Amino acid sequence: MNKLSSIEVRNKARNGENFTTSGLAQGYVQTNVVIIPKKDAFDFMLYCQRNPKPCPLIEVFDPGDYESNFATKSDIRKDIPEYKIFKDGKFSSNSTDITEFWRDDFVTFLLGCSFTFENELMKNGLDLPYFKQGKNVPMFITSIDTEKSGKFSGKMVVTQRWIPREKLVRSIQITSRFPNQHGTPIQVGNSSEIGIVDPYKPDFGDPWIPENEELIPVYWACGVTPQIAIQEAKLEIMITHSPGKMFLTDLRDEDMAVI
């Protein structure tokens, strides 16, 4: 499915198919999604602005709108492979279609995702085995506090990729070109420095067991971070994408690159 267009991936999700989007529609920008009531939207937008590394804003919808300006004929209620619904800060259910939950006061936020720069990493010879294995990137809750806004606060979540020592500098250079997709790493080589006790046991996604000692764990900020903040805020209702199952836009990766 890596040769599909963004529209084709959205249509598969709209038809009820449930799948991980890592490696799909390569070259198209993928985003994290957060949907919350209007009364909480300003504080959350400020939270994103204060924490641009894990929460890079791509688009904010008007209340009640469900079509993205960056995805032709899209429907945010149906075009994600799987959603997570939270009520009063607690997980309620998963769904492949949130039309029945939709409200006119819902505000949708699209946030940058590191899947965007993965294509560039692979072009430069970096192996990301979870693509071939149909698995999800490892994600960890760190000990790093995010900057508070109103009721929103929490720990930063990161993604993990094991990078060959000789390609470490190149991987940092590549990801630095994508500040709206988390940019440069948060930490390189020392998992415990950011509170990760066991780098082989992620909080979300699938474990990545390195093949040799030349691979170094590298951590990038992750768009699952706001899900943690919103859960702790105990909003009456929140809807997000499921980790690793993103929204595909029609934007191209090169549209996001700064150099």
Task: Label the model's feature ranges.
Residues 1-111, 123, 158-259:
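Metallocofactor- and cofactor-centric catalytic cores in central/energy metabolism, strongly enriched
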Residues 25-26, 149-153:
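Short, flexible turn/loop "capping" segments at secondary-structure junctions
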